[in-house]
Amino acid sequence: PNEVMTVDPVLYDALKKVSDANCREIYLGPLYASLENLCMSNDDAAAAQFDPEKDDDAAEEAAAVAAFAQNPDDISMEFPGENQVCLHVSDAYQAYAAEMGYTAYLDFFWMKNAFLIDYLADTIRGEGYQLGIISSKDGFVRCLDETGEKEYQYPLYHLSGNEIQSHGTMMYEGPKSIVFFHAYQAGSPDTYRYYQYQDGTMRTPYLSASDGKDHTAASELIVYSGEYGCADTLLAAFFDYQAESLSGELLKT
């Protein structure tokens, strides 16, 4: 931290985009590491040790990291230009990180594939390809088709109780970016990002910088855009998905 580094242009653009959107969740790197430990636990007792809703030490850690993450004086990014980035970290946060044994302050975590798919889409288009779909198993889709001559399908699901049920199909024409927020495991990449307790309680990767805990306004939310990529679509809707309830008016904007 506190040194200017030259990074790959793709990484620079991704960091700049997150910073411009004021998405402080990228600064929750230490808590994402704890969440991975929770999700890889073999039983509820082991998982609870990493759960701020069930363990006092975990709750104290989540609150501390969130407090640092919220405060630009404690952690922030500066972009001098020329693909240069400087991660500013306060002495207080560095001391706490050393005490806790943290190795990373930043992590895109569940957001990473949105940026990767956008990069692949831009690269493919740059080579002259204008058809096809790029998708990831954790809920990001880019349809490149600009002809308007073909109709595409996106399956819809809904969590009812503990059962994931099919709820039809969304038909669309390209180009389109689709982001699928979901409060349950929906694919193999979710294995290390979600954990379900025996009582049905689910922990998700949607941690908030407000308190370091996961928040979801609904069991699922599909957001799409014909103008923006997956990353911009994600950043535009993420805070609404973390609200106490979904606002249709906000999502329309």
Q: Each predicted region: which residue ranges?
A:
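Mature catalytic core of soluble alpha/beta enzymes
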Residues: P1-T253
